[in-house]
């Protein structure tokens, strides 16, 4: 018989550095999920990723207090800030430019994020990434 799902939880956890401290500990503890078991499993799976990059994780927990989780790729904004060497986007996107990013970098980001985006081809994924860049105040050149 299949396990009965009790719910889902979405978190953004830095790669390789999941700890029982807030915000992870309280979010998992409230739902009766073994915090240390999650931290060890997450850190083991994310050890080959860039340390500290924010990894969206979807945790499915069951009524018997067990859980499974899936990791996604870091957010588009993380890749854009990294590619443009920015700390944050523009305070007034559309009026004030935060920097520039090449179409080649946009394509690279789109190919990396392709499995998580709701796009059928790379061109559609590129348009989504360009939209994110514009909303951050980045100018797409080339």
Curated annotation (Swiss-Prot):
Pfam families: Ribosomal_L11, Ribosomal_L11_N. One of its GO terms (molecular function) is large ribosomal subunit rRNA binding. NCBIfam families: L11_bact (TIGR01632). This is Large ribosomal subunit protein uL11. One of its GO terms (biological process) is translation. It comes from Chelativorans sp. (strain BNC1). Transmembrane segments: none annotated. Keywords: Methylation, Ribonucleoprotein, Ribosomal protein, RNA-binding, rRNA-binding. The gene is rplK. Residues 86-105 are annotated as: Disordered. One or more lysine residues are methylated. The lineage of its organism: Bacteria, Pseudomonadati, Pseudomonadota, Alphaproteobacteria, Hyphomicrobiales. It comes from the Bacteria.
């Amino acid at each position: 018989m299949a396990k009965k799902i009790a719910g889902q939880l979405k978190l953004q956890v830095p790669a390789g550095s999941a700890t029982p401290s807030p915000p992870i500990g309280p979010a998992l503890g409230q739902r009766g999920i073994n915090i240390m078991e999650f931290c060890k499993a997450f850190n083991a799976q994310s050890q080959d990723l860039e340390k500290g990059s924010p990894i969206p994780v979807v945790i499915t927990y069951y009524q018997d207090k067990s859980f499974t989780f899936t990791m996604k790729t870091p957010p588009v904004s993380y890749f854009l800030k990294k590619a443009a060497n920015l700390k944050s986007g523009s305070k007034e996107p559309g009026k004030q430019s935060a920097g520039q990013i090449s179409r080649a970098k946009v394509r690279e980001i789109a190919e990396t994020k392709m499995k998580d985006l709701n796009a059928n081809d790379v061109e559609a994924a590129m348009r989504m990434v360009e939209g994110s860049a514009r909303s951050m105040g980045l100018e797409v050149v080339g």
